[in-house]
A protein has these predicted regions:
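Nucleotidyltransferase catalytic core that binds NTPs
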Residues: 1-126
Length: 126
C-alpha cells in the first residue's frame, strides 16, 4: 500500500486544499491530511474546528484520514513511518520555499521524499 502525508495549517480549509486532497487521493492508497499546530501562534480558526471541517470535506474520499501534530514535520514522518510528503505549490516562489523546507527536513530525517503538486490554476487564489 502506497501512502502519503499532506500537511498544512488549513487555517482556513480552502477549495484549493480540497482539490489537492482529491487529486492526491486518486494517486495514493492512503492519504493522511495532517493539521500542523504551531503552539506559538493562535490561528484564526481553532484546531478542533479545522479538523472537523476537514473531516466533513473529505467524506467523499474514503482513503483520506485526518490527523494533527504539534511538533516538527520531520518527526511526524519518522514516527508515523511515512515516506512520501505532498506539498501543494501555487507559484515559482513557493517552489523555492518548498525546496528550502525539503533541504531542512532532509537534515532532520532522510527517510522520506517530498513531492510538489501544482495547484489548479483556477483555484490558486482560493
Amino acid at each position: 500500500m502506497v501512502s502519503c502525508v499532506f500537511p498544512g495549517s488549513f487555517d482556513p480549509v480552502t477549495r484549493g486544499h480540497i482539490n489537492l486532497i482529491s487529486r492526491t487521493s486518486a494517486l495514493f492508497d492512503r492519504v493522511t491530511v495532517t493539521v500542523m499546530i504551531n503552539i506559538h501562534k493562535s490561528g484564526a480558526i481553532p484546531v478542533e474546528k479545522r479538523i472537523e471541517l476537514l473531516k466533513k470535506a473529505c467524506r467523499p474520499y474514503p482513503n483520506v484520514k485526518i490527523d494533527s501534530w504539534d511538533g516538527l514535520l520531520a518527526d511526524y514522518m519518522k514516527q508515523k513511518k511515512e515516506t512520501i510528503l505532498i506539498r501543494g505549490v501555487r507559484s515559482m516562489s513557493e517552489i523555492d520555499q518548498e525546496y528550502q523546507s525539503c533541504a531542512a527536513n532532509k537534515l532532520l530525517h532522510t527517510g522520506f521524499e517530498t513531492l510538489l503538486l501544482p495547484s489548479d490554476p483556477l483555484l490558486t487564489g482560493v
